[in-house]
């Protein structure tokens, strides 16, 4: 059980294998019942390696703003209808709809507004959180293959991921020194 004050413990499966680190509990009562959130081991492993090697987590960015295309339980009826209409217009049922490509970002000059990201490195992207999870496993400078639907056709592009400063250099924590 995850209770207030004891997050950070191991999340194991029925075989006793580590699958994540408990990070947060959302509960109306504050204990026992509610929703528990964990960081998957695939992301945790990269975070630990980054902290050891660089003193801070190296975050790779695609350089887009977007939203999940398709219906979502949290959408109101009007928004769900708009998203369904947009999906039909673009010829795709789900993925990440690009609203804007950030100037100087990894996707600049390659991806476009109204492209729908449906895959990254051979894995399907159904919603925005799928894209976030895939990017969390990478560092600036890594190359990724991004599959999109553009003009109702599937296309694939190779992009070099950048950091928040728009380059591929290691970001150092200002308060720490590398040894």
Each model region followed by its residue ranges:
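A short acidic, helix-capping loop that chelates divalent metal ions and anchors anionic groups
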Residues: 29-32, 74
């Amino acid at each position: 059980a995850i209770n207030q004050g004891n997050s950070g413990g191991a999340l194991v499966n029925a075989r006793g294998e580590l699958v994540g680190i408990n990070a947060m509990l959302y509960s109306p009562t504050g204990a026992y019942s509610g929703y528990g959130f964990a960081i998957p081991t695939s992301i945790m492993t990269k975070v630990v390696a980054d902290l050891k090697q660089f003193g801070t987590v190296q975050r790779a960015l695609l350089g887009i703003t977007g939203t999940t295309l398709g219906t979502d339980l949290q959408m109101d009826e009007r928004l769900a209808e708009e998203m369904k209409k947009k999906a039909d217009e673009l010829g795709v049922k789900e993925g990440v709809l690009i609203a804007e490509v950030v100037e100087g970002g990894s996707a600049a000059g390659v991806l476009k507004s109204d492209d729908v990201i449906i895959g990254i490195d051979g894995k399907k992207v159904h919603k925005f959180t799928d894209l976030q999870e895939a990017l969390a496993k990478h560092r600036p400078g890594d190359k990724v293959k991004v599959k999109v639907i553009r003009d109702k056709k599937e296309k694939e592009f190779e992009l070099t991921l950048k950091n928040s400063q728009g380059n591929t250099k290691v970001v150092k924590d200002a308060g720490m020194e590398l040894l």
